[in-house]
Swiss-Prot record:
Family affiliation: Belongs to the HrcA family.
Species per Swiss-Prot/TrEMBL record: Rhizobium johnstonii (strain DSM 114642 / LMG 32736 / 3841)
A Pfam family that the UniProt record links to this protein: HrcA
GO terms of biological process kind: negative regulation of DNA-templated transcription
Name recorded for this polypeptide: Heat-inducible transcription repressor HrcA
């Protein structure tokens, strides 16, 4: 058949039509039922006429390539992780959502959240993804920048001051800053007054942009030491270690992952998955995965080191803010037997919807 090669990838690419058809049927059967497919059943459903013996020969070649395996003696075949990746890359057809499907997603996320704050909308997005995927729907939200209300500089030592930033909902952030040599108390007050005059109703990134546009005003209104103080105050808040990092994971549909578990080993893998999801580093890793490419990313089993022990698949896409920055991610986690062709466009559209809605509410 000409599929044996020193390069597995070359051999896979050279699979003939009947090998591809048999492989495709095995994977589709697995995704639909989770059960192995044997040569006798395959010979009945193939579009070409092949005996069970001929099918077994093809299956043997596919197994040698690492695309399929036999879960136990005398069983049919299931796809390996490599086989699933090959199927997703080479065979899977992802279509556009129908108008009805888009309207259904819009309705669930918009209406069920009742126009409430962003967190309610994210909850509904996670719940909706869980419902359509039969996996666990997830939404990761990044730390949002508070709307600024007031700033104050309090001298602690001759060369140090406490910069106090008060945001909407009375969030307070304190940072210690180094003072320029020779700065006076009146200059501390002058710098704070200048910031307060320009910060009302703005986030810190917006304030930074505005001050950049107002360079001439800054030069005219403030002396050199006060200008330096303003820049130091903004810089120390911009350097917050939590800025832009995910702070919340919203996950719905964990019970879906309990369905179809075969025994203690599956329960242990599921426990590992839940443990991973509770770690802060895991949230950052998921967001990094979403950022590492355009559109929807698919990670199968151990391709994603985060979930390699639990053998789970992750389908994830980023959502963005008004400045087109990635500020979070939506996705689905589940067993490798996910309906990838259906879930991918759902995740993609949901990410776009969340981007639009969060921009209007943030």
């Amino acid at each position: 058949m000409g599929i044996r090669s020193t390069s597995v990838s070359d051999a896979v690419a050279a699979l003939d039509e009947r090998s591809r058809e048999i492989f495709r049927r095995i994977v589709e059967g697995y995704l639909e039922s989770g059960e192995p497919l044997g040569s006798r059943n395959l010979s009945r459903i193939l579009p070409m006429s092949l005996s069970p013996a001929s099918v077994r020969n093809v299956m043997s070649d596919l197994e040698e390539l690492g695309l399929i395996y036999s879960p136990h003696v005398s069983a049919g075949r299931l796809p390996t992780q490599i086989g699933l990746r090959f199927f997703v890359d080479a065979f899977m057809q992802v279509g556009d959502l129908s108008a009805e499907e888009r309207a259904s997603i819009d309705r669930q996320v918009r209406v069920e959240s009742g126009g409430n704050p962003v967190e309610s909308m994210m909850n509904e997005a996670s719940r909706m993804l869980s419902g359509i995927s039969r996996g666990a729907g997830l939404v990761i939200t990044s730390k949002s920048d508070p709307v600024l209300k007031h700033v104050e500089f309090i001298r602690l030592e001759p060369t140090k001051a406490l910069a106090v930033l008060v945001g909407d909902h009375d969030q307070v952030e304190n940072r210690i800053i180094e003072l320029p040599a020779g700065v006076t108390s009146s200059q501390l007050t002058e710098a704070a007054n200048f910031l307060n005059a320009h910060m009302s109703g703005q986030t810190l990134p917006e304030l930074r942009k505005q001050l950049s546009r107002l360079k001439d005003d800054v030069r005219h209104e403030l002396d050199a030491l006060s200008r330096d103080l303003v820049e130091r105050g903004i810089a120390v808040w911009a350097g917050s270690p939590d800025e832009g990092k995910p702070t919340q994971l919203i996950i719905r549909g964990r019970a879906n992952l309990l369905e179809g578990l075969a025994g203690a080993e599956d329960l242990d893998r599921l426990r590992l998955l839940f443990d991973d999801l509770e770690k802060k580093d895991s949230l950052i890793e998921i967001l990094n995965l979403a950022e590492s490419g355009s559109g929807v990313r698919i990670f199968i089993g151990s391709e994603n080191k985060l979930f390699s022990l639990s053998g789970s698949s992750l389908i994830v896409a980023p959502y963005r803010d008004d400045d087109d920055r990635i500020v979070g991610a939506v996705g689905v986690i589940g067993p490798t037997r996910l309906n990838y062709s259906r879930i991918v466009p759902m995740v993609d559209y949901t990410a776009q919807l969340v981007s639009r809605l969060s921009r209007s509410q943030l």
